[in-house]
C-alpha cells in the first residue's frame, strides 16, 4: 500500500479528534498534501512545487516540520541513481523509435514577467485598493501587497500609544535593542523585529496603550573600526593623519547614511515603531544621561581610576572588558593569522629555557607558551613542597638580556606536574602572575607599547613587534645556551571579538566600576521574580555570571563615542609630565562644573584641566537605554512618568551579560526601579549548515534581499562593497553559489516574519534555510487565493452580521466555528506564553488545513446547490471565519492581512485599519464539541476513501462503503454522508453506509477508521493480477510487523522515559501508525483472498 495510506492511517488509531490528526506534524514545509484535501497537493494559482529543505545540523533547530534525516540515505541514493539510469535508458530507447509515432508536444510559453509594480497612492494616504483582476493582484505579489500601507500607518499615527482604544486595557512598552550603525541589518535583526512587532501589534489589537521606541547605537569600537578600514581602503590613510575632529566628522557621515538605511529596513519589515520618539545613543538626552550616571557613580566612589591589568587589543589600541574577548582553543602547534603580520604566527607550543642562578653555575628551567614575555619577568615561583627546588628558594636568578634579578619564591598555586614545576612570573602581562606578583611584592614591568611593539624595558629587543620577538628571543636564548626545547601544548588563545587580534594582558591606567554591590542587586530582582528572564537556560546563565562578577573596565582608547567627563588637574610647573598614581582628577557633567569642583578642592593653587581623551565603553551608555529614551535624567518627563519601567526587553541571549545585566544594574542604581519586568532571549541564527553567520563566509543574509529578492550576481557584487579581503571574497562567493544558485527569490516581509517566528521555539540556535522562507511565501498565496474565493462568493449587497445566529447552522458550519474558536484560544495562549512557533502552527493549521482544505471545499456544494437560506448562512460563516483568520494573523503578517481586510465588506463598528481592530477572543457560544467530533469522524472516512482511491488509481466511477457496527456510529456517519461525498474527491461517485448486519461487498480494499467504523472501496475490477497484489500486500505486512517490533523495543528500553516529551510522543505515534497500517493490510488481504474463491 502506498505512502498515502501511511499518512492517513494516523486517523485510525485516534478516536474522533481531527486536531490530533493535523497537529502531529509541526508546520509542514515544504507541505505535503493536506490531511483533508485530495491526495495530490492542491497547488493554488501562483504557486510552484516546493523544493524539499535539507536536514540541518543536529545541534540547532531545523525548520519546523522539515523532514528528518533518514538513516538509510545511502540506500535511498543508490535507488535513486539506479532509477535515473533506467530512465536514461528508456529515454534513449524512445529516441530511436520513429518520430511519426506521436506528435511532439509544443512547449508551453512562459508567462512573461510582470513589470515592477507602481503604486498610485499619494504618499502617506490610505492605499488605493486595486481589483483582483489587476495583473499584480490576481495572485499574491509581495511588492504590490506591501506597497503604501506603512506610510499610511505612520502618517495616521497608528504607531503612537495615543492611538489605542479608550479606555485602554493597560500599557505595553518595548525599548528596541538599538542596532549598531556599522552597516546593514541581518537576519538576527529581522528576527528581533518580527518577534517584537508581533507582540506590539497583538497588545495594540487587545486595546493596550503600546509604545515601541526605535533607535540606533553608536557602537564605539565596531563603528570606529569599520570607518578606519574604509578610510584605509579608499585613501590609504590612518585616522591619526586626519586628526580627531575630522575623523569623527567622517564617522558622523557614516552614521547618517547607515542610520537611515537601518530605519528604512525596519520599516520595510513592518515594524510599527513610534518614530516620533526615535533615539540615538549619542543624541543630546542620552549624552546627558551618560554624563549624569558617570558623575553620580564617581561621586559615590563606585567609579575609580586604577593602573591595573586589562585586556589590551594592540590592533585597535584600546582596553577591552572580559566580555569583549573570545577564546580560540587549539590542541597543539598551530600557525594563525594575526592582524598586522604578513606571516602566520606560531601558537600551541611550550618553550623550555633556563635562567642562571645568580652567583652560581646552577640553572633553573622554566616553560612558557609566550617566550617574548620573559623580557618582563620579575620572579620565579615553585611549589613549597617540591624538593627539586627547596635549596633555591630565597635565591635569585639573573635575567640574560636586562639588568634584573628575579627572586625565587614559593606558592601553592604552582602545579608541580606541569612543565618543569618552576613558573616564570610576568606580573604586568599575565592575569595569574598579576595576583602572584601582588602576593610576593614583585616588580610590575610593562614591556609593551600600546601598538604591540616592545618598549625600553625590553632592552635589546626594543622596537620589535611582539610576535617577531617571540622568535628572536628564542634565537638569542639558543646562542647563550639557555634554550632547552619546544613541545606541543593545547591552549586557549584570547582574541579581540571585533578585530580577532590576540589579546595582550597589559598594565594601563583605566576607569573602573565597582560591580559587587550593583551585581548583588541585579541578581536579587531576578531571584525575587521582579524581572523574569526566559528561557530558563538564560536565567541560569545570568545568575551564574552575576555570582562571580568582576569590576568593569569602562574606558576605551577611542575617538568615537562618549568622551569621558573626567579632567586631569595639571598644576603649575607639572606641565608635560605623564600621568602617574599621584595625578589628581575631577569629574563634571560639563567642563564648567569640573572647573568649579577643582577650584573648590585646590583653592589657592594654579592649574589647568585636561579632559581624558578616552571614550566610555559603548555598553555603559547603552546600559541606560530603557530610561534615557523616555527622558531620564529628567524624572518629570511625561514619557518617563507614564511608560517607565518598560514592559519587556526582547534580545539575543548572546548580549545577556554585555547589556541586559548592566541595564538592570544601572537602572536600579539610578532610579531605584527595574528597567523592564520581562526579558525574552531569542536564539541565534546560523546558516543552513549550522555555521555562525559571518560576512567573510558570505552567509550573512540581508533581510531586504529576502523581501525583494536578489540575483546571484548582485549577491556577489555586494561582497565587493565592504571591507573583505580578496581571499574572503572568494570564499564567500563560493558559498553563495552553493547556497543560492538561483539567487534569492522575492518572499516579501510577511513570509519572512512568519518563517522567523516558526523557527522560534525557545530552544537552541536556528539553522536558517532560504528555501523554507520561500515555501511560506506559498502560504501567503494560499491566504490570498482563499480570500479571493470567499470575496467572490459574497453578493454585491452582502451585509455582515455583528453576531452570528448559529441556531440553524449546519454541522460543517458549527465545526469551522468550533475550530476557529480553538485557534483563537490557542493563538492568545501561545502569544501570552511567548511560544511563537506554536502560534504560527495554530494559525497555519486553522487557515490552511481547516478553513481552506475542508470548509471552503465543503462550502462549494452548498453555494451551488443549497437553498437560499443555506447559501446565505454559509456566506456569513465564510465571511466571519475569514475576518477572524485575518485578525488572528495580523500581528505576524501585517501587510497581507491589512490588504485583504480592507477588501472585506465592513460591519458596524469597524475602524479604519485592522491594526486597531479587536484581536479575536474566545467565545463560549461558539463551542460545538459534539458536532465537531461528529464531523471529524466524517472527515476521517472521506480521508480513508481518498487514500484507497489513490492507492488503486481509481480516478472515476469509484464505489465506496462505510461499515458502521454500532447504532451511534451508524447515525453519525449517515448524518455526515453529504459532507463525506463532497470531500471524497472526483474519483468516487458513490458512497453508501452499511449497518452492522449488512453484508460487505466483495473485492474491496479496506481502511480501518476505528473499532466501530471501516471504509471500503471496490477495487476488484481494477486489479489484473490478484496473486501479485496479495504478494505485494503480504510483503508490506511483513515490513510493518518489523516496524512494530522495532518501535516496541525502543519504547521499552531503559532510559527512554528520560528523552524529551516530544520525542516520546513521536515514537509512540510511529507505533500507532504502524499498528493501524497492519490492521488495514490484514483486512485487505482477507478481502482479496475472497476474490480468488
UniProtKB/Swiss-Prot annotation:
May have a second function in addition to protein synthesis. HAMAP family: Val_tRNA_synth_type1. ATP binds at residue 695. A motif ('HIGH' region) lies at residues 179-189. One of its GO terms (molecular function) is ATP binding. It catalyses: tRNA(Val) + L-valine + ATP = L-valyl-tRNA(Val) + AMP + diphosphate. Its EC number is 6.1.1.9. Residues 45-69, 85-103 have a biased composition (Low complexity). It comes from Neurospora crassa (strain ATCC 24698 / 74-OR23-1A / CBS 708.71 / DSM 1257 / FGSC 987). It is found in: Mitochondrion; Cytoplasm. Belongs to the class-I aminoacyl-tRNA synthetase family. GO terms for cellular component: cytosol; mitochondrion. Residues 70-84 have a biased composition (Basic and acidic residues). GO terms for biological process: valyl-tRNA aminoacylation. This is Valine--tRNA ligase, mitochondrial. Keywords: Aminoacyl-tRNA synthetase, ATP-binding, Cytoplasm, Ligase, Mitochondrion, Nucleotide-binding, Protein biosynthesis, Transit peptide. A motif ('KMSKS' region) lies at residues 692-696. The keyword Ligase applies.
